[in-house]
C-alpha cells in the first residue's frame, strides 16, 4: 500500500527535527536488512538520506557517485555487503550511533 504524501511529509519533517528519530530510522533499516527485508531497509535509508538532504555528502564520503547511491537504494537496487556496511557506518557516524547486534 503506497504511503500518502501527507504521511511522507510528516515523516520527513520529524527526521529534520528529531535526532532520536533519525537514529531510529538507521537502526530500523539495519534490523530490516538483518531480517532479509531489503526493500524496507533500502526505503528507510533512502528516507533518511532524502530528509536530511545528505545524499551528496554521504556519496562523497563513500567515494561513490551520488546517482549510484540513489540507484543502490532504489526499488531495483541491490547494494553489495561492502557498500551497505559502509553506508551504515557513515550514517551512524553522522548521528553518533554505535550499532551492534544482539540476540533475544
Residue ranges and their predicted role:
Residues 76:
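Major-groove DNA-recognition helix of helix-turn-helix-type DNA-binding domains
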Residues 9, 71, 97-104:
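Short, charged recognition helix plus adjacent turn
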Residues 50-70:
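Short alpha-helical DNA-recognition segment
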Residues 1-44:
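N-terminal flexible/basic segments that precede or flank functional cores
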Residues 81-98:
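DNA major-groove recognition helix of helix-turn-helix/homeodomain DNA-binding modules
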Amino acid at each position: 500500500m503506497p504511503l500518502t504524501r501527507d504521511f511522507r511529509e510528516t515523516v520527513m519533517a520529524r527526521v529534520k527535527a528529531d535526532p532520536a528519530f533519525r537514529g531510529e530510522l538507521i537502526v530500523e533499516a539495519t534490523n530490516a536488512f538483518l531480517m532479509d527485508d531489503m526493500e524496507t531497509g533500502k526505503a528507510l535509508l533512502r528516507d533518511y538520506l532524502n530528509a536530511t538532504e545528505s545524499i551528496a555528502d554521504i556519496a562523497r564520503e563513500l567515494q561513490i557517485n551520488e546517482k549510484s547511491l540513489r540507484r543502490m537504494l532504489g526499488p531495483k537496487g541491490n547494494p553489495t555487503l561492502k557498500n551497505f556496511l559502509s553506508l551504515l557506518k557513515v550514517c551512524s557516524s553522522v548521528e553518533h550511533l554505535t550499532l551492534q547486534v544482539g540476540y533475544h
